[in-house]
Amino acid sequence: MDVSTKLFGTYFATHHGLVRTRELLAFGYDDERIRMAHNYRLLVRVRQGWWALPGTAEILLRAWRAGGRLACVSALAFHGMSLELGDRLHIEVSAGSHGALKPGMCVHWSTSQANGDRRAVSLEVALRQASRCRVTTTAPPR
């Protein structure tokens, strides 16, 4: 592994595994280098304008592709709590998001996404969400 590959991995780690195209450009990658990294499978396109490294957990990719991050019981499991999750992935999206509804997902709509990181809500927020979760609720608050 060369120095640039190590720096690249470190850069992704500091961004919790998910990096915007504009962040890669600021890091020194141009569009051609990003395209080449993707073609050589050194980068995984998560959705338009977002990238991850190969080997990123599929549960995180599913949440990000739906436009959110892990929430509720999915975030609790991510934070190391042993739970029976069932088949539904719980994600948090901003209240104004569109297109996040996907089969097999429970969407938690939020007006504030300040707690946690790009991967998941904080443990505190996940516990609060789980205490109020009604798995069939997938509509934004009115």
What do these predicted ranges mean?
Residues 1-142:
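Short gly/ser-rich loop at a beta-strand->alpha-helix junction or flexible surface loop bordering the NTP-binding
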